[in-house]
Regions:
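Cytosolic, long alpha-helical scaffolding segments
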Residues: 1-211
Length: 211
């Protein structure tokens, strides 16, 4: 997929691309949740997530290329790069977790994995809403802040789920391979929420600079 933004104002071009990245995160998160809730056609579903991850890489490439050809940016270029990078990190973590389910030949996701995937969708929803508001001006920009706070809360919830999951994992049996597989999956799912929190923190900094 290619973007047609040649005739967009420079302000709108960057906001459009960042919003597209957040929309893509939401799509990837929903695909992950579907994988965890309906664990069938796993190879096809993981492949779909990989395609969305590659599309996300294209968005980030477009942002980087646009920065090289734009003298004046609507917000600091360092903030644009940081935000784009953190958004890309969210997708990378989701894709990695999905790839693990295929590579490790997981028979069925656990309730902990399903719970974490639901939290990731909630984080993605908040990010998409926040990125859609980024182009607003003045005091309205501050409406992003409650969304950032909610992402931080969700990340804390994911930490708690991870702690419970790891505790259950190490008391449920002595199958070392099983433990190692699920340790990787749990940690990577939780990492997606960490990266969402990183993006929220960058957003918060942008809001405080420009509102």
């Amino acid at each position: 997929m290619k973007f047609s933004f040649s005739f967009m104002p420079k302000d709108e071009k960057f906001f459009f691309l960042l919003h597209q990245s957040a929309i893509n995160i939401h799509q990837v998160a929903m695909s992950l949740q579907d994988l965890m809730q309906n664990f069938e056609n796993v190879s096809a579903k993981v492949g779909e997530i990989k395609e969305l991850e590659e599309f996300g890489d294209q968005i980030i490439h477009n942002i980087t290329q646009s920065l090289h050809t734009t003298f004046v940016t609507p917000i600091d270029r360092e903030d644009i790069l940081a935000l784009a990078g953190r958004l890309d990190d969210v997708i990378d973590a989701i894709d990695e977790a999905a790839q693990y389910t295929l590579a490790y030949k997981i028979e069925e996701p656990t309730e902990f994995a399903r719970h974490l995937s639901t939290i990731i969708v909630s984080c993605a929803d908040q990010l998409e809403r926040a990125m859609g508001m980024l182009s607003t001006r003045s005091s309205k920009l501050r409406e992003i802040l409650p969304l950032s706070v909610e992402i931080n809360r969700l990340e804390n919830e994911a930490d708690q789920v991870l702690s419970l999951a790891m505790g259950d994992l190490f008391t449920d049996g002595t199958d070392v391979v099983h433990i190692l597989k699920w340790r990787d999956i749990y940690n990577t799912l939780e990492e997606a929420t960490d990266r969402a929190e990183d993006a929220a923190n960058v957003l918060e900094g942008i809001v405080l600079k420009h509102s």
